[in-house]
Curated annotation (Swiss-Prot):
<dbReference type="InterPro" id="IPR011332">
    <property type="entry name" value="Ribosomal_zn-bd"/>
</dbReference>
<protein>
    <recommendedName>
        <fullName>Large ribosomal subunit protein bL33</fullName>
    </recommendedName>
</protein>
<dbReference type="GO" id="GO:0006412">
    <property type="term" value="P:translation"/>
</dbReference>
<dbReference type="Pfam" id="PF00471">
    <property type="entry name" value="Ribosomal_L33"/>
</dbReference>
<dbReference type="InterPro" id="IPR001705">
    <property type="entry name" value="Ribosomal_bL33"/>
</dbReference>
<dbReference type="GO" id="GO:0022625">
    <property type="term" value="C:cytosolic large ribosomal subunit"/>
</dbReference>
<keyword id="KW-0689">Ribosomal protein</keyword>
<dbReference type="GO" id="GO:0003735">
    <property type="term" value="F:structural constituent of ribosome"/>
</dbReference>
<dbReference type="InterPro" id="IPR018264">
    <property type="entry name" value="Ribosomal_bL33_CS"/>
</dbReference>
<dbReference type="InterPro" id="IPR038584">
    <property type="entry name" value="Ribosomal_bL33_sf"/>
</dbReference>
<comment type="similarity">
    <text>Belongs to the bacterial ribosomal protein bL33 family.</text>
</comment>
<keyword id="KW-0687">Ribonucleoprotein</keyword>
Amino acid sequence: MAKSNTVQIKLVSTADTGFFYVTKKNARAQTGKLEFRKYDPVVRKHVTFKEAKIK
């Protein structure tokens, strides 16, 4: 069997609320860290979420 290209990552809120999303990314196609503006329900605003490893 071939090795999978996709890895699971955690998108952590930069508002320091502890809220995070879990998503997948293609590790070979996107070598940099992902950064999105998504909704954080703790602060009830759209904030920047940055990629972190799932431990």
